[in-house]
Swiss-Prot record:
Keywords: Nucleus, Ribosome biogenesis, RNA-binding. Involved in the biogenesis of the 60S ribosomal subunit. May act as a specificity factor that binds precursor rRNAs and tethers the enzymes that carry out the early 5' to 3' exonucleolytic reactions that generate the mature rRNAs. The lineage of its organism: Eukaryota, Fungi, Dikarya, Ascomycota, Saccharomycotina. Gene3D superfamilies: Ribosomal protein L30, ferredoxin-like fold domain (3.30.1390.20). This is Ribosome biogenesis protein RLP7. It is found in: Nucleus, Nucleolus. CDD domains: Ribosomal_L7_archeal_euk (cd01657). One of its GO terms (cellular component) is nucleolus. One of its GO terms (biological process) is maturation of LSU-rRNA from tricistronic rRNA transcript (SSU-rRNA, 5.8S rRNA, LSU-rRNA).
């Protein structure tokens, strides 16, 4: 694990430098993405470097997802994780669906011995935890996330990773085609280093709509 903020920043910087040859794919404009953890290549051991980044992003469970702001620094991290994740740009409607229907947070109250996970359905809780940032309701969280506001990191780390309940290639009328596409991508991934494996992008709006 990366032990503190200084080490985290240094580690991300090193990964970004390693992936600098691919940065031309990044348009230069910060963009909202949802990144979802997938099983990865069958029988493959996750490299320690990849495991660290998965932990940094809190993607510790298969089919868990988090919002990220794609930047020049973050892009190489996504390249590194490409054999073990899929990504997509969520619409405002999808951000709203995820936050309103699937968001949970981990909180500690005065009488609790340990932190506990609760469903995010109380504006009072939002104001209690994020009021100092000017965020007082669930709709504020949706706005700050979708607009990549200055509080984006605070807001997205307040949310637990979303727990999704379907395999990302097993839904919708094009499921068979998507499975074939993923199988082809898997072949490329197995013969590629993590940093050069293709990033698999899906229709995240359709995926989330199928779940809710």
């Amino acid at each position: 694990l990366v032990s503190d903020a200084s080490n985290t920043k240094s580690y991300i910087s090193r990964v970004a430098q390693d992936g600098s040859k691919s940065k031309e794919i990044y348009s230069g404009k910060p963009t909202l993405y949802l990144i979802v953890r997938t099983p990865g290549p069958v029988g493959a051991k996750i490299p320690s470097k990849v495991q660290k980044v998965l932990q940094l992003l809190r993607l510790n469970k298969i089919n868990s997802g988090v919002f990220v702001k794609l930047t020049e620094t973050v892009y190489p991290l996504l390249k590194l994780l490409s054999p073990y994740t899929v990504i997509x740009q969520p619409s405002l409607q999808t951000v709203r669906q995820l936050v309103q229907k699937r968001a949970t947070v981990t909180v500690t109250h005065a009488n609790d011995e340990e932190p506990r996970q609760v469903k995010l359905n109380d504006n009072n809780l939002v104001e209690e935890k994020l009021g100092d940032e000017g965020i007082i309701c669930i709709e504020d969280i949706i706005h700050e996330t979708s607009h990549l506001a200055t509080t984006f990191k605070t807001v997205t780390h307040f949310l637990d990773p979303f727990e999704l309940n379907k395999d990302v290639v097993g839904y919708g009328p094009l499921a068979k085609l998507r499975k074939l596409e993923k199988q082809e991508a898997e072949k490329q991934r197995k013969t590629s280093n993590s940093g050069s494996a293709p990033i698999l992008e899906i229709d995240i709006d359709d995926f989330v709509a199928q779940q809710n």
